[in-house]
UniProtKB/Swiss-Prot annotation:
Belongs to the papillomaviridae E1 protein family. This is Replication protein E1. ATP-dependent DNA 3'-5' helicase required for initiation of viral DNA replication. It forms a complex with the viral E2 protein. The E1-E2 complex binds to the replication origin which contains binding sites for both proteins. During the initial step, a dimer of E1 interacts with a dimer of protein E2 leading to a complex that binds the viral origin of replication with high specificity. Then, a second dimer of E1 displaces the E2 dimer in an ATP-dependent manner to form the E1 tetramer. It is an enzyme of class 5 (isomerase). A motif (Nuclear export signal) lies at residues 102-111. It comes from Human papillomavirus 27. GO terms for biological process: DNA replication. Residues 180-346 are annotated as: DNA-binding region. There is a cross-link at residue 552 (Glycyl lysine isopeptide (Lys-Gly) (interchain with G-Cter in SUMO)). One of its GO terms (cellular component) is host cell nucleus.
Length: 643
């Protein structure tokens, strides 16, 4: 157990400060003494311990482990400093990093830093420095793009070059970049090229044709909007395809105006097309991409300006030159704005023509008239003048007002027989009178008694001017009355509006009226205020913004779930009402299909069948006394002049 351990060494080997040395404990096994070279002596009493270390570092007395740790720490610190010097940017270059590496939008939100350099690229495509000298680049650095010379560090930018296929200097063409690592940079560059593509095509178009593309077209924001006329400009078309498109496009179009030019990208085909049917932008894009064999993003597709004289003159003038090929009939919007004859025919807007249009089409709503008349601008000169006017709202309001006046006067001078004939002439279908008779029999109503009451009702005989249809719910009371009201063009009044002074105003513009679903409160109101209305005598009706109107109340139909003849509180209404009871549920042949259909055609046939029984004037008598249904004309006719 007491074998001698350790390594023999001289004192000179252990005292050299510049090299490695061995310090070992020398133990005398007999006396168990520790060598004086050892730092700690457990047998010492502590009286001669020196608490202040006055040793000079590096005198050769350090512990080897501590020295080794210091050397490792120094090496790590040197390595970290080298990395920081290489990768960490200084405060002076922080602005350049943000401009080149990040989006300009991120730099725009900074409050302290203002950059004066022009920003044309969002990402720097330079790969990370490998540390082995300069790296040859294929894409220009941001210093080259912005036009600034490399003034930081005093080193010029070397070995940087850019290769493009088209020579136009834009980002839409293919850019060859070295395989420097990630796919993210490549996808971002593809996105940038796509965003700049349209601007590049517009610039090239103006350079080739000498006119802006949007000066000839109007923009459709939606690609689903259909139009028959389209302006297409395709870039990068092969020569053989550009020559063959003149024949390939003919089966799809009625008119084509084609121009073909040559540029550094290839052939450019510029076309004005009128398709056989209306198409949207997506359909046109797919069609032209298939015919021209080019990507859809290499085309500009918009509809032409239809009311622009300069645009029409451009198409007219270029069609006369030898640089264009045209086939088909020239569109009317070009002819209208270019030919002398059509220019002389342009006239100012005439309100009477618009009023006649509203009268002929029975339009009494301003919004409907404005929409319908504006659609005639391509075929009607007065409608085109209406669209060119700055007073469209005033014209529409005046035309509807005049149409209502004419309609009201025409209705007032017609008798009930003439009015039924007038309304029946508007129905072109052939109907059957039997469903009406069968429905009345289904409800237990005698047809003869109904005809007798209906004859007095149409004549407006006093005390017989109101018919009440009484019965439980879902028996067809409203269905029967509404169908008759629609055929005769009547008006509906509602007790819900009885708080207004003008709730009876619709009766002044109709030949027949309907009060649907009268409640006990409604019958009490009628018994209090509207007895003369049920009599058929002249009454005074208040109208909004107008003076009181005195007129004879038109025949009035009332539907109700309450029998007013059985209530003693309404005993004064019994002599003024003619009551018919509907007790049976409304019959259906199938869900949603009535067993006895009652429509305008059936009512027309019913009146024709029972014309004599209702004691209506025959059409022959009307012709003898003068036909009051002569078409109204507020526009003077054209005089035919012989040559």
């Amino acid at each position: 157990m007491e074998d001698s351990e350790g390594t023999d060494g001289t004192e000179e080997d252990g005292c050299r400060a510049g090299g490695w040395f061995h310090v070992e404990a020398i133990i005398t096994h007999g006396q168990r003494q520790v060598s004086s070279d050892e730092d700690e002596d457990c047998t010492e009493t502590g009286e001669d311990v020196d608490f202040i270390d006055n040793r000079v570092p590096g005198d050769g007395q350090e512990i080897p482990l501590q020295l080794y740790t210091q050397q490792i720490a120094q090496d790590d610190e040197a390595t970290v400093q080298a990395l920081k010097r290489k990768f960490v940017a200084s405060p002076l270059s922080a602005c350049s990093c943000i401009e080149n590496d990040l989006s300009p939008r991120l730099d725009a939100i900074s409050l302290n830093r203002k950059s004066e350099k022009a920003k044309r690229r969002l990402f720097e495509t330079e790969p990370p420095d490998s540390g082995y000298g300069n790296t040859q680049m294929v894409v220009g650095t941001p210093e080259e793009v912005t036009g600034d010379e490399n003034s930081e560090g005093g080193r010029p930018v070397e070995d940087k070059e850019e290769e493009r296929q088209g020579g136009d200097g834009e980002a839409d063409l293919t850019v060859q970049t070295p395989q420097s690592g990630t796919d993210a940079a490549g996808s971002v560059l593809t996105l940038l090229r796509s965003s700049n593509l349209k601007a590049t095509l517009l610039s090239k178009f103006k350079e080739l044709f000498g006119v802006g593309y949007y000066e000839l077209v109007r923009q459709f924001k939606s690609s689903k909007t259909a139009c028959a006329d389209w302006v297409v400009c395709a870039f990068g078309v092969y020569y053989a395809v550009a020559e063959g498109i003149k024949q390939l496009i003919q089966p799809h179009t009625q008119y084509a105006h084609i121009q073909v030019l040559t540029c550094s990208w290839g052939m450019v085909v510029f076309m004005l097309l009128r398709y056989n049917c209306a198409k949207n932008r997506d359909t046109v894009s797919k069609n032209m991409s298939m015919l021209l064999n080019i990507p859809e993003k290499h085309m500009l597709i918009e509809p032409p300006k239809l009311r622009s004289t300069p645009a029409a003159l451009y198409w007219y003038k270029t069609a006369m030159g030898n640089g264009s090929e045209v086939y088909g009939e020239t569109p009317e919007w070009i002819v209208r704005q270019t030919l002398v004859g059509h220019s002389m025919e342009d006239e100012q807007f005439r309100l009477s023509v618009m009023v006649q249009f509203a009268y002929d089409h029975d339009i009494v709503e301003e919004s409907v008239l404005a929409f319908e008349y504006a659609q005639l601008a391509d075929v009607d000169a007065n409608a085109a003048a209406f669209l060119n006017s700055n007073c469209q709202a005033k014209y529409v309001k005046d035309a509807v007002t005049m149409c209502r006046h004419y309609k009201r006067a025409e209705r007032a001078q017609m008798s009930m027989s003439q009015w039924i004939t007038f309304r029946g002439n508007k129905v072109l279908e052939e109907g059957d009178w039997k469903p009406i008779v069968k429905f009345l029999r289904h409800q237990g109503v005698e047809f003869v008694s109904f005809l007798a009451a209906f004859k007095l009702f149409l004549k407006g005989v006093p005390k017989k001017n109101c018919i009440v249809f009484y019965g439980p719910a879902d028996t067809g009371k409203s269905y029967f009355c509404m169908s008759l009201l629609q055929f005769l063009g009547g008006a509906v009044i509602s007790y819900a509006n009885s708080s207004s002074h003008f709730w009876l105003q619709p009766l002044s513009d109709s030949k027949i009226g309907l009060l649907d679903d009268a409640t006990p409160q409604c019958w009490s109101y009628i018994d209090t205020y509207l007895r003369n209305l049920l009599d058929g005598n002249p009454v005074s009706i208040d109208r909004k913004h107008k003076t009181l109107l005195q007129l004879k109340c038109p025949p009035l139909m009332i539907t109700t779930n309450i029998n007013p003849l059985e209530e003693d509180r309404w005993k004064y209404l019994r002599s003024r009402l003619t009551l018919f009871t509907f007790n049976n549920p409304f019959p259906f042949a199938s869900p949603g299909e009535p067993l006895y259909p009652i429509n305008n055609a059936n009512w027309k046939c019913f009146f024709q069948r029972s014309w004599s029984r209702l004691d209506l004037n025959s059409p022959e008598e009307q012709d003898d006394n003068g036909n009051t249904s002569e078409p109204f004309r507020c526009v003077p006719g054209d005089v035919a002049r012989t040559l």
